[in-house]
Amino acid sequence: FSESFGEEAGAHFTSRDIIYLMTDLLLSDADLSKGGNVTVYDMAMGTSQMLSCMEERIQELNTEIGVTCFGQEFNPSTFAIAKADMTIRGGDPNNMRFGDTLSEDQFSGYQFQYIISNPPFGIDWKREKTAVEAEAKKGELGRFAPGLPKISDGQQLFVLNGLSKLAPNGKMAIIQNGSPLFSGDAGSGPSEIRRYILENDWLDAIVQLGTDMFMNTGIS
């Protein structure tokens, strides 16, 4: 399965070990004893396995909690699988939406308690350039006010998308390669995005994964 889809531009499949690490980090200090409902969002959901693992972990902590999952995906094949999987699991398939997250945001105005995602590594955003730049000009009304990364790597755009959708006291776990940590000179778009994250105290931790964790990629 991963050989069929994983080599498409920047696409890669995430092992369950990594997903469970992310879910456990997100839920490490969560108070879920009171029940209720929580929302989970994946901006590049693939086949929605991160969403299903997050739901599983939350309900292991408290079976009385309702979990509502939301996701967006641009690959038609994996989107179809995600929507079918959500239906089988008894969720709302209408919360699984098709489209390019950077240029066709299907969840504008939404806020989520948990965001978990593994968006594409090092893929350019030339196709989305017009839409992204137009949204950046909206300032605080858009997702990309803090700055724009270099055109050759859109990873930081996904980070900004996630931050724009966090509910108060919400948490996000996102996988990136090393580029967003170091790219760009002082005062450049990538640098200003990092400044925005740090000055607003958005960053709790950076976890370095081992090598060869992603199939069908040269990512170490």
Locate the predicted segments by residue.
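Long recognition/docking surfaces used for binding and targeting
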Residues: F1-S2
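Short hinge/gating elements
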Residues: F5-E7, S179
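Glycine-rich, flexible loop/turn motifs
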Residues: E8-A9, S103, K137-E140, G210
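Short acidic-aromatic active-site loops that bind/stabilize oxyanions
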Residues: E8-R16, G147-S152
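Conserved S-adenosyl-L-methionine
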Residues: H12-S117, G122-E133, Q176-S179, A186-I193, ...
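Short beta-alpha connecting loops at secondary-structure transitions
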Residues: V67-F70, G142-P146, L209-G210
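Conserved Class I SAM-dependent methyltransferase catalytic core
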Residues: F79, L148-I219
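Conserved catalytic motifs of ABC-family nucleotide-binding domains
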Residues: F121-D124, E128, A134-S152
